[in-house]
């Protein structure tokens, strides 16, 4: 019989996140356990956030948004990663369960954005807005992020 939880030590924040995600996520995927506790060398709020993110990552329904983005490549022509990080930051505390996609190009981006409740697939100075799989309109200019946030709050 395997012993999965024999130690309770946090380690550094990032390594603690990785170890907790792998250990707790692995057990949950195997159907082991009905309660989780994440220990990190961080504020208790960060531990709770990590727990919710682990649950979300293994497919459990969790209140709040899930923000996805692409790893970016040579086709990326706008600040996709920065926008995704800012969207996630602005949605902290938002309780509606939605999947938000911020994709970096017009080649693969539209497919991923269609899979989300709301998403954008960007190009140079613009992004196509998708809501529930349908292209709705182009967002243009220097305030694509603000325009996108307005649309997120509408759904």
Question: What are these language model-derived features?
Answer:
Residues 27, 70, 105, 113, ...:
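Conserved, mostly hydrophobic/aromatic
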């Amino acid at each position: 019989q395997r012993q999965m939880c024999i130690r309770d030590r946090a380690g550094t924040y990032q390594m603690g996140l990785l170890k907790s995600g792998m250990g707790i996520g692995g057990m949950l995927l195997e159907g082991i356990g009905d309660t989780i506790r994440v220990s990190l060398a961080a504020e208790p709020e960060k531990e709770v956030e990590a727990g919710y993110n682990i649950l979300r990552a293994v497919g459990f329904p969790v209140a709040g948004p899930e923000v996805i983005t692409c790893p970016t490549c040579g086709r990326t022509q706008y600040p996709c990663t920065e926008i995704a990080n800012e969207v996630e930051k602005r949605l902290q505390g938002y309780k509606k369960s939605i999947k938000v996609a911020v994709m970096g190009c017009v080649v693969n981006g539209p497919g991923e954005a269609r899979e989300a409740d709301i998403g954008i697939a960007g190009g140079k100075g613009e992004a196509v807005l998708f809501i529930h799989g349908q292209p709705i309109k182009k967002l243009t200019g220097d305030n694509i992020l603000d325009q996108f946030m307005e649309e997120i709050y509408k759904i």
